[in-house]
Every structure is written in C-alpha cells, then in structure tokens.
Design a protein with these regions (language model features):
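C-terminal "cap" of GNAT-fold acetyltransferases
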Residues: 124-150
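Conserved N-terminal entry element of GNAT/NAT acetyltransferase domains
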Residues: 1-9, 144, 148-150
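Conserved active-site alpha-helix within GNAT-family acetyltransferase domains
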Residues: 105-131
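A short, internal acetyl-CoA/4′-phosphopantetheine-binding micro-motif in the GNAT/acyltransferase core
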Residues: 70-77, 106-107
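Conserved acetyl-CoA-binding loop-helix of GNAT-fold acetyltransferases
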Residues: 78-91, 103
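Acetyl-CoA-dependent GNAT
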Residues: 8-9, 16-64, 68, 73
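Conserved GNAT acetyl-CoA-binding A-motif
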Residues: 93-106
Length: 150
C-alpha cells in the first residue's frame, strides 16, 4: 500500500471511484476529461496494484487551496486511507507555501479530527463563484465548509 501522485493510466480508476460517490450525491460528478486535465492535482492510494482511494488538491489563490474529490473504496473505509490522503494534500500545501486549506464535506467529524474547523461558505468566494454556481444544489448547498490554517 502506498500513496503517490496520480498518473495518466490512473484516470479511469479515479473516475470510477468518484462516480460511486457522485451517484449517491455525496460529491459533484467529475468527467473523465476533467480528471485527465487535472491529473497532476490528484493523489491515489494503491493496494496490491489497485487504486482504492483518491483525493485532489485544488489551488484557488496564493494562500488558499481545497481538498476535494476525496473518495475511498467501500472495502477500505475506516482503515486510515482517507486520513493519509488528506495528510498528503496538507503536506503538499505546506510545501507550496499555502496558508489555508478548506473542504466542503458531508463528513465534518472526519475533518475535525484532522484539525479542520467550521467556517462559513461566504469565506470562500473563489470556490462559490467558480464551482458552486454550477452545482444543482446552488444556492442551497448542504455541505459543511471547514478549513485548517497551516
């Protein structure tokens, strides 16, 4: 088992993981072309050659990034996969000199255990006007905004 930066051949497996969550309305759907375009922002968690988890770090501004598209295969949940993936994003964000990382989530307890705190979505104008306006739930988003200061 290992966490690593995603590569082009991983895109279809990442897409399949994300589709599972999108079909349950737990995250926005991401197209395969979008994943290819942003493959450098993804990490994967691999077990015996199979991708069982993924996450993406989206940079929004000079001091702000988002942990997004966090997905773990059902059989791998509650084993630290998600935590390790988010930790990889936080380490990359620190290395890039970012000061704050946020997430929009339905799993606030998970992020709270990692040191994230609750914030208002209004603190994230770049996200709101770029991604959120495309969401079918906008403006009545039911995800919880959380952030961590690095």
């Amino acid at each position: 088992m290992a966490i690593r930066k995603a590569r082009i051949p991983d895109a279809k497996a990442i897409h399949q993981l994300l589709i599972t969550y999108a079909q349950q309305e737990l995250m926005l759907s991401r197209s395969l072309p979008d994943i290819y375009e942003k493959i450098r922002s993804f990490y994967v968690y691999e077990v015996s050659g199979e991708i069982v988890g993924t996450v993406s770090l989206q940079i929004w501004w000079a001091d702000l990034a988002e942990v997004r598209s966090l997905a773990v295969a059902e059989g791998q949940m509650k084993q630290g996969v998600g935590r390790q993936l988010v930790q990889a994003c936080l380490e990359e964000a620190r290395g890039l000199g970012l000061k704050k990382v946020f997430a929009l989530t339905y799993q606030p307890v998970f992020f709270e255990k990692m040191g994230f705190q609750y914030i208002e979505k209004a603190e994230l104008p770049q996200k709101i006007w770029s991604d959120c306006v495309k969401c079918p739930k906008f403006p009545d988003c039911d995800e919880i905004a959380m952030s961590i200061v690095l």
